[in-house]
Amino acid sequence: MYLRRALIAGGSAAAAILGVVAAGKSKGGSDSEILSVAPPATGQWDRNWDRREPISMVNLSKINAETGEEELQLHLNKHKPKATRHIFLIRHSQYKLDGKTDFDRVLTPLGREQADLTGQRLASLGHKYNHIVYSTMTRAKETTEIISKYLPDVNKSSSDLLREGAPIRPEPQVCHWKPDFVYYEDGPRIEAAFRHFIHRADPKQEEDSYEILICHANVIRYVVCRALQFPPEAWLRISLNNGSITYLVIRPNGNVSIRMLGDSGFMPAEKISRT
């Protein structure tokens, strides 16, 4: 009976995956269907949202029918995560909006102060951070350099996946219109960033981890919507201050919670900006 239930569960997961693929194909519907790279919201929590639910990691067709239950349990234990991931999403500090190229869009003096305050705040939380990953855009790199002064022993790496962009056409529609190709190009990359960085811990990870991603407002807002299984097109309804901290927790069972969203309360009021 246990094996039968597992097979049914595995079939449901497979059906869900096939459903996501089918949803991305055009059926003569609206442009939003074609441009969306995220699974449609159902109103129910998808336990296998990161495709790392232990049952989905097991090739059920290889399970021996006679020793099925015991063999299946061994496989499930092998793929079962043990650690919790703590992910801090930091929005870059204020930068010069009038720069002609990304190289020219450096932090303002206020932006450098904001990054300094964010670095102090992260250090004061007392966590043993495992890694910092930052966007390759100038404003994110400069924010990282300043924050790193307060976390000198934390390894850093960069990722183009975290660069700013337009993830999906927002709802409700806004006045600053963008052509479809912008979402068509940026959307899959930002979705790829979500899938690459936001998931439950690897089964081999023994201890809880504390990771920092330093990137951009659109990326963070989209990631929050996807991680909490909110409609992804709602991303623009969220507003984030420069240098703010958003804190996600991913449990071994795949449950996700948010402990901070755009927190900038550690900054004096006169140092807060949103550009």
From Swiss-Prot:
A GO molecular-function annotation: protein serine/threonine phosphatase activity
Q: Which SMART domains match?
A: PGAM
Query: Which InterPro entries did the record assign?
Result: His_Pase_superF_clade-1, His_PPase_superfam, Mito_Ser/Thr_phosphatase
From the broadest rank down, the organism's phylogenetic lineage runs:
Eukaryota, Metazoa, Chordata, Craniata, Vertebrata
> Record's family?
Belongs to the phosphoglycerate mutase family. BPG-dependent PGAM subfamily.
Q: Chief subcellular site?
A: mitochondrion
Where does it sit, as one GO cellular component term?
mitochondrial outer membrane
Highest taxon of the lineage: Eukaryota
Q: What is this protein called?
A: Serine/threonine-protein phosphatase PGAM5, mitochondrial
Organism equals Xenopus laevis (African clawed frog)
Role according to the record? Displays phosphatase activity for serine/threonine residues. Has apparently no phosphoglycerate mutase activity. May be regulator of mitochondrial dynamics. May be a central mediator for programmed necrosis.
Give EC number(s), comma-separated.
Answer: 3.1.3.16
Subcellular locations according to the entry? Mitochondrion outer membrane
Top-level EC class as recorded in UniProt: hydrolase
Q: Which UniProt keywords apply?
A: Hydrolase, Membrane, Mitochondrion, Mitochondrion outer membrane, Necrosis, Transmembrane, Transmembrane helix
What the entry says about post-translational processing?
Answer: Phosphorylated by the RIPK1/RIPK3 complex under necrotic conditions. This phosphorylation increases PGAM5 phosphatase activity.
Gene3D superfamilies recorded: Phosphoglycerate mutase-like
An example of a Gene Ontology BP annotation on this entry?
programmed cell death
Q: What is catalyzed by this enzyme? A: O-phospho-L-seryl-[protein] + H2O = L-seryl-[protein] + phosphate; O-phospho-L-threonyl-[protein] + H2O = L-threonyl-[protein] + phosphate
The protein's topology relative to the membrane is:
Single-pass membrane protein
Q: Which CDD domains match?
A: HP_PGM_like
Positions of transmembrane segments:
7-24
Record keywords: Transmembrane helix included? Answer: yes
